[in-house]
Amino acid sequence: MIDSLDLVIDTVLAREVLDSRGNPTVEAEVLLEGGAIGRAIVPSGASTGAYEAHELRDAGDRYFGKGVLKVVENIEERIAPTICGLSASDQATIDGVMSELDGTENKSKLGANAILAVSIATARSAANGYGMPLYRYLGGPMASLLPVPLMNVINGGAHAANNLDFQEFMLVPHGANTFREALRMGAEVFHTLKQLLSEKGLSTAVGDEGGFAPNLQSNQAAGDLLVKSIEKAGFIPGEQISLALDVASTEFFKDGAYFFGGRNYSTEGMIEELVKLVNAYPIVSIEDGLAEDDWEGWGLLTKELGEKVQLVGDDLFVTNTSRLQRGINQKVANSILIKVNQIGSLTETLQAIDLANRSGYTSVISHRSGETEDTTIADLSVATRAGQIKTGSLSRSERVAKYNQLLRIEDELGSEATYAGSNDLGPLCGKK
């Protein structure tokens, strides 16, 4: 039996650490009266939506302005005195107290990175206090669904120094029976792709998220390479492994037009290009197919493709319930990308997932391009039964760490574990 006093927050500490790009980020530690401790490190994005919560940086010369000593100070001198003495098991109260202390809509006073680090560290400390894994603490007895990984094996856009306009070209091994099998399938295609790139004399250097970053003639060339890699690895495209795209179109949207492939496209022209891709390749998911403020265009895109593929809002929704509700009301998209640092607290993240579930939208739990060894999103994907996770390619330890955590969870669950697979993507698989 847990003594409630053991769950009371005693100490909150913070430190400046580095992310996978060598940039500073913040780690928080929450120590409870009973001795349990929770740690969390927050990630950082490269292609960030205009409506994301504010990531606080120091400015100045140190780390070229990217230091987070101000964030550390805010945690230890402002947040800590406010939440010490509260129970770590009362997540919503603690997150609410921090948001109130900040007092801004986008958490710009204390920094979303400060609030999120403490929020997740609090949840981890409570889980450890109860002696249970994080996915079980957050998700309860129903937390047993392992997600389909959307594996970013070709990087472009803001994630790589190459000539590809689209940001991510992903493998979706929905035809597997277990997560372990899905991971193997993805890894085998990844290595086959590397071999094909080498044979063509193309670069096998990797981008921020561990995928290859070759200079290819077009986005279609990337699709062709992935289909060939799937087949050469011994799998059936569209049946065992499909494709997903993160277009990240806000990055090349300017003055009302989309510029990629050397020419400008209207919204209607952009939609036409996406339709061509869906008809030509086994694509089951498209993220940010249009820009974050092109609401009218998103409505047209959803009418055109919403019954055929998963249309994911990332920059469009930024894990924000207000923007998601607008999308629901306007029948825009059918899925939300969940990035904990876009909204800045665990409670608000869970609220966004809940709203999506209640509204018939899917949720895709996601990493950021600037990641760390923190594996919270792996547990979160199982806790919420989201059914899908984006955590990069099959290389770079900060990406693989999440996959390995999911393997541990699957082993721990044993016969209770189920793999989302084609069932979770549902009619989106093979609905062409």
UniProtKB/Swiss-Prot annotation:
It comes from the Bacteria. Its cofactor is Mg(2+). Mg(2+) binds at D246, E287, D314. It comes from Prochlorococcus marinus (strain MIT 9211). Keywords: Cytoplasm, Glycolysis, Lyase, Magnesium, Metal-binding, Secreted. Pathway: Carbohydrate degradation; glycolysis; pyruvate from D-glyceraldehyde 3-phosphate: step 4/5. The lineage of its organism: Bacteria, Bacillati, Cyanobacteriota, Cyanophyceae, Synechococcales. Catalyzes the reversible conversion of 2-phosphoglycerate (2-PG) into phosphoenolpyruvate (PEP). It is essential for the degradation of carbohydrates via glycolysis. This is Enolase. It catalyses: (2R)-2-phosphoglycerate = phosphoenolpyruvate + H2O. GO terms for molecular function: magnesium ion binding; phosphopyruvate hydratase activity. GO terms for cellular component: cell surface; extracellular region; phosphopyruvate hydratase complex.
